[in-house]
Amino acid sequence: MTLDDLFSMRGTAAGQTNIRNLKAMQISIASPESIREWSYGEVKKPETINYRTFKPERDGLFCAKIFGPVKDYECNCGKYKRMKHRGIVCEKCGVEVIASKVRRERMGHIELAAPVAHIWFLKTLPSKIGTLLDMTMADLEKVLYFDSYIVLDPGSTSLAKLQVISEDQYLQIIDHYGEDALVVGMGAEAIRSLLEELNLEALRAELREESQSTRSQTKKKKLTKRLKIVEAFLESDNKPEWMVMEVVPVIPPELRPLVPLDGGRFATSDLNDLYRRVINRNNRLKRLMELGAPDIIIRNEKRMLQESVDALFDNGRRGRAITGTNGRPLKSLSDMIKGKQGRFRQNLLGKRVDYSGRSVIVVGPKLKLHQCGLPKKMALELFKPFIYSKLEERGLASTIKSAKKMVEREELVVWDILEEVVREYPILLNRAPTLHRLGIQAFEPLLVEGKAIQLHPLVCAAYNADFDGDQMAVHVPLSVEAQIECRVLMMSTNNILSPANGTPVIVPSQDIVLGLYYMTVERSFEKGEGMAFCAPWEVVAAYDAGSISLHARIKVRMPDGRLLNTTPGRIMVGEVLPEGVHFDLVNTVLTKKNIARLVGNAYRDAGTKATVLLCDRLKDIGYEFATRAGVTIGVKDMTIPQSKKGILADSQAEVDNIERQYRDGIITRTEKYNKVVDVWTKATQDISQEMIKEISYDVMRDEKTGKEELNQSFNPIFMMSNSGARGNQDQMRQLAGMRGLMAKPSGEIIETPITSCFREGLSVLQYFTSTHGARKGLADTALKTANSGYLTRRLVDVVQDVIISEHDCGTVDGLEVGHLIKGGDIKMRLAERVLGRVTLYPVTDPETTEVLFPANTLIDENVAKKLDEAGINSLHIRSALTCRSDRGVCAMCYGRDLARGHVVNIGETVGIIAAQSIGEPGTQLTMRTFHIGGTASREIERSNIQAQYTGRAVLYRVKSVRNKDGQHMVMGKSGQVGIVDEQGREREKYVLPSGAKLHVEEGQEVKKGQLLAEWDPFNEPFVSEVDGLVKFTDIIEGKTVQEKADEATQMTTQTIIEYRTTNFRPAVALCDADGVVKTRPESNIPASYSLPVGAILMVRDGQEITAGDIIARKPRESSKTKDIVGGLPRVAELFEVRKPKDMAVVSQIDGIVTFAGETKGKRKLVVTPETGDEKEYLVPKGKHITVTDGDFVEAGEMLTEGHPELHDILGVKGEKYLANYLVEEIQDVYRFQGVGIDDKHIEVIVRQMLKKVTVLDPGQTSFLVGEQVDKAEFRIENQKAIEEGRTPATAEPLVLGITQASLTTSSFISAASFQETTKVLTEASLRGKNDHLRGLKENVIVGRLIPAGTGYREYVHSDISVPEQKERPDRFLEELVGAPQPVVED
């Protein structure tokens, strides 16, 4: 099975250039005729070469007559030599006189003595031959491997056609009916004749009819599967019998070489061994047949032939793999193309590159941003050809050979020429692992002594490089086009913003930040305080003269006329600002965040060129003043707070108290654990705050007046951490505060914290406790790097063909976006969320209703600011999810190109950028788990809600009861409380947990900071809604409830336990005096409360209680530390649409929940809507139900704890909701780690997951029921049907995991190079699939330019005229860095 097209192009001169004009590539099953056509002769002997003459044996596997001469233009016997005899066939040895490279393309063949089934079509599940003949795999194998007979024609017997019978059964039937009563067959011949007999047209009609008439779903599925294969054969030109081979092709000998080693031995490709076995067995079979050997011997030989061909095509697929001399399985044809070492991934997608070198990197603090230091030795080697041609051109060398000698001798003139060649010649620097496109950037080389590459310090963040021994690779772009691309697109100066989130990636770090921070800090009572200056230059002069200190507080008249309070240091930083950048941005303490803001603003306000110059100047002054400051760390700098002892003593007392309560049985073990952990977390935070307070301020005294003032501290550790140069508060805390709680390997938090810090030193026990965290960190790093890399690979594969294909798709659909609110706090404002997007509808002012912005406006910083000022809370934006482009996405739906700041260009590969943006931090995060040393960090549990705004309280769906203290207790989980301002706009909204005490009423005026509600963060209470007598049902000692007496406390608590039998339902009912169960207020639901496993009873049977009393409480889960390690698998789980481990039950309709007993050991919940049928849900025993009896739930709401399954969300809430849910959940994981990724990247990937639909009813189209079809294809087909007056098909949306989506892509080349290569190729060849080469991968594989960026069809087919230029202008870089992109003329 080979690619016909490639063979038709073979050998022609046009064949070499033809690849550019390929329209599509087709794969199909090769017919015996076509295999013979490709072949140049039959291989009859298993011999390879003659061991004495080393010449190929005639008719053997390396035969020169079949495959071509071994030496260029020389026949085997040596009669004809040299070019003049080209094309002659030697009459003596039969070899054509031609170039020996034909041995790479000429094929041979083996004529098989008996047909053989192709293992791919037999064993790739589901078996193609089996499905077509409607036979099981086991039966098929029995027949093919000569174990049983198959009935070809039952004749007069009672057997059915295609029935498989054993040898014994066959003999019995012959005894009974006689020899000629039936026709049976065995082996591939029988199967071949059956396949030949098939009438596919009739079979199709029959299957379609049967599929429509049947009721059984399983049968329908089976029929559809068979129908698909039948249709595939009918639509392609393939014939079923070609799945059984009569001829085996032999690949060209140069592709399975035989290489002589020293000592007269040979190394050979495994394929030669496999071919040899096939030929040997084939020849033996021919001989046995000619001799008329007994049937059983021939059968055995045929079986062995089948097995040897199987091994040749796919060794190890069936039975044991054939091994070579050293016991290693031989590599078959399938293994050659499969996996990381296979043809696709090793040789076609990843090639080694010429003109490249690698070396260690060192920092180059003196370089400009567009430069890198290249060692002279490397440059000499990389630019050799250029030097040769220059030497020849100058007349310094007469031939290339003499030029070569000059270069080898390293003559002086060579170095001058090298300087000239290298000047302004862009080169590429790459650091592995290249996780995003900023891992390869272009620089101009400066020749340097030594052997290390010098790297500009500001690009280290993009490369994630440091100088502890990292290596980088250098590549030289050769063609003019490549050089222009490097210059205009890849130059480090053109990659200032990160493609992931649009923030600057070229930002000073470490020393530079420290230097700038030091410059801009102000101090009291410094030399020159209070002086006033008439202009910035005067300040610099005064500082240089030594009459003022760097940190003195002074007044300066600025060029715009304002008199500003500032310091000399800030004025000096202000001097390097480009025009258009406000001095106010540096008239503050420059921390890393502020510097990033400065660079971002400079980029927007002053342009690329100015920003580049600014960054370089900041780097220079930053280094200079970091050196002048001379900041170092000493042990004394780690000041331990005075109050540490007190805080520890108080906490210990509190913990002792909790222990006492636990012993007295007031609280349970889980509660004790939670409370203790909370106490220590709080203690750690308190000590940490105290330490920071003490370390972050110095008290300055004025010697003259004795006045004292607080100043920001000059403590080196504090300066490093506060400026963002190195370290964080967490690490400072561990140095000088306390290390805090640690986690066990299982993720649980150990109750005893490490109270010492590193300055005090750890005891042996404390040191031992902290080893857990350290080891976990290292283990995680090793394991997760691989996971993250694999996630990136899958992401890239699913979106590799998403390209910006048009300017506007004209959709009227989009997404509604509002503020991002978590737990009532606005985590991200609307303006931030919609930045860089395009509005879908005109935006109107909520108060005046005037139109602020028309539809299709790109929201840039200015528009976003206006949105914020107008108080707009939500608006509709366009999104990749709703884009209607058939291929790729349109520019308007995508919005801004984050790395460039304007609307995205047509031809941009937004898919790959999205995949890289999501995959890159994955690796970063996994590598950074251990930075906190496994110290358990955990937020103190929230236990109340305070108003963030002043306004009026509004209650939504709140059910509450008044308890005896007159407080409102919230019932159920569906309640929310919100605040509305005077205009009636909702400002905030919070979910109220069950059992919360509510402090406000509907419509009450609320001040900012007022307490709205509070609750117990460790327990979930079950509150009684009515007064009455307690009556226990199914609460039976030892069966459903256990009196847990603590060994430590001797106190007993009654806890509901896991119960084995199914018919128990522990509950507490409230009755009147006669024992009749009361009903809940405002409903007729009985006041009976079912209790989950783990609930602790707070009342006794028969006790009298009032409304609002707590019947029982369930401790909330003890907290485990969250790591991104929990995060990466979560991201993968979402992208792969896997069933979550803790799957939640989701309601599919709106309605009221009622608890309806148990069935099969599961609790039954019924949701009753206002109209229509009710729905039942079964909940497993241990699962905690999050709704209470009588709650109102919306469709899509979770009834139990856990994560909902994505298919459920899609079914209930639809595509948009699902897409939104996915984006939010994935963003949660990344935000938790402080990683910023723009939503649009995740949307692009989710778009690919949702690009298919499942056909429900094919109508009068060519689709089949249950078929998965591309949305675009489905739309087009339906449109056609409607135009022609046929019934269109109906379908439902489908969500696929990224691996599945990659494998079902329309390009078989791309899918095959991803995973499951043999399966993909088998399916594709069966369908005779065309690959239209639209994605990036398939084009790289066939060796063309990718259809994106400068290779996009609109750019490639246009003529660009460039005026002649003799000399390259000196300031080529300056021109280009600030220059716009080249204009393309059509």
Curated annotation (Swiss-Prot):
| An example Gene Ontology CC term for this record | DNA-directed RNA polymerase complex
Origin: domain of life: Bacteria
What lineage is this protein's organism placed in? Bacteria, Pseudomonadati, Thermodesulfobacteriota, Desulfovibrionia, Desulfovibrionales
**A Gene Ontology molecular-function term?**
DNA-directed RNA polymerase activity
Top-level EC class? transferase
Q: Which family does it belong to?
A: Belongs to the RNA polymerase beta' chain family.
Q: Which UniProt keywords apply?
A: DNA-directed RNA polymerase, Magnesium, Metal-binding, Nucleotidyltransferase, Transcription, Transferase, Zinc
Mention any Pfam family matching this sequence: RNA_pol_Rpb1_1
List the catalytic activities from the record.
Answer: RNA(n) + a ribonucleoside 5'-triphosphate = RNA(n+1) + diphosphate
> What GO biological process terms are annotated to this protein in UniProt?
DNA-templated transcription
The Swiss-Prot or TrEMBL record lists the needed cofactor(s) as: Mg(2+); Zn(2+)
Asked if the keyword Transmembrane belongs to this entry, the reply reads: no
**Where, in this chain's numbering, is Zn(2+) 1 bound?**
75, 77, 90, 93
- The question of whether Transferase is a record keyword is answered with yes
Self-association state and partner proteins as the record states: The RNAP catalytic core consists of 2 alpha, 1 beta, 1 beta' and 1 omega subunit. When a sigma factor is associated with the core the holoenzyme is formed, which can initiate transcription.
Please give the name of this protein: DNA-directed RNA polymerase subunit beta'
This chain's function reads: DNA-dependent RNA polymerase catalyzes the transcription of DNA into RNA using the four ribonucleoside triphosphates as substrates.
Binding sites annotated in the UniProt record for Mg(2+): 466, 468, 470
**UniProt: Zn(2+) 2 binding residues:** 809, 883, 890, 893
Q: What does the cofactor section's free text say about binding?
A: Binds 1 Mg(2+) ion per subunit. Binds 2 Zn(2+) ions per subunit.
| HAMAP family in UniProt | RNApol_bact_RpoC
What EC number(s) is this enzyme filed under?
2.7.7.6
Please state the span of the N-terminal signal peptide per the UniProt entry. Answer: none
